[in-house]
């Protein structure tokens, strides 16, 4: 059974707008609350049930909006409250960046079901647990804030590049082809013999 939608009157919308305090500190705490909720949802989606693409997209979009808002907002004068109880050294942007990378990775790993009827079976709903090494790398600063180009700097492309075999340059004619030079004629005659045989 689906839920019923309730329509707001114009008066209710005005009252709701008046309730919100959009001062910098209130906005910062609102963003941190959204981040915590998104983190909880990401951690719950790594559980034994099948991940939902719609949920990943919603969380991904929320985190991108938060990251964009944080980059544009000036730094607060007060120190922000810790994001994690045991890991206070993480910055907000590093955390958001790692979550976005983890979401992208998990979305890439998801494969669409080949048969829609087969996807509803209980066996297909059980997904293996996430790799602990992957989660450890995700929770640490292993990936950091490096850009996409930084990942490709160490790749050796020399084996991929096509070596074009150019013929060796011809020696200048002034060295060997001087008029009356018997060496040039001798070499030319030897080449004719080799090619002719």
UniProtKB/Swiss-Prot annotation:
Q: Which species does the entry assign this protein to? A: Mus musculus (Mouse)
Q: What does this protein do, in the record's words?
A: Antiviral interferon-stimulated protein that plays a role in innate immunity and in the suppression of viruses through different mechanisms. Plays a role in the late phase response of TLR-induced immune effector expression. Strong transcriptional coactivator.
Where does this one sit in the cell? Nucleus; Nucleus, Nucleolus
Q: Which residues form the SERTA domain?
A: 27-74
Q: Which InterPro entries does its entry note?
A: SERTA_dom, SERTAD3
Give a single Pfam family match: SERTA
Query: Know the name of this protein?
Result: SERTA domain-containing protein 3
**UniProt keyword annotations, A-Z:** Activator, Antiviral protein, Host-virus interaction, Immunity, Innate immunity, Nucleus, Transcription, Transcription regulation
Span list, region Disordered: 1-23
A single GO BP term for this record reads:
innate immune response
What superkingdom heads the lineage?
Eukaryota
- Which residues are in coiled coils? none
Q: How does it assemble?
A: Interacts with RPA2.
Q: Which residues form the signal peptide?
A: none
């Amino acid at each position: 059974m689906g839920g019923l939608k309730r329509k707001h009157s114009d008066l209710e919308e005005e009252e709701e707008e008046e309730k919100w305090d959009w001062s910098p500190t209130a906005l910062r705490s609102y963003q941190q609350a959204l981040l915590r909720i998104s983190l909880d949802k990401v951690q719950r989606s790594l559980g034994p049930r099948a991940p939902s693409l719609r949920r990943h997209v919603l969380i991904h979009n929320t985190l991108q909006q938060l990251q964009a808002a944080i980059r544009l907002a000036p730094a607060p004068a007060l120190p922000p409250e810790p994001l994690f109880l045991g890991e206070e050294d993480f910055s907000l942007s590093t955390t958001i960046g790692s979550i976005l990378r983890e979401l992208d990775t998990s979305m890439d790993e998801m494969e669409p079901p080949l048969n829609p009827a087969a996807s509803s079976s209980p066996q297909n709903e059980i997904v293996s647990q996430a790799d602990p090494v992957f989660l450890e790398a995700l929770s640490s600063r292993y990936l950091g804030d490096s850009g996409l180009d930084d990942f490709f700097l160490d790749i050796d492309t020399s084996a991929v590049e096509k070596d074009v075999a150019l013929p060796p340059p011809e020696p200048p004619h002034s060295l060997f082809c001087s008029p009356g030079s018997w060496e040039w004629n001798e070499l030319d005659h030897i080449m004719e013999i080799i090619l002719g045989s």
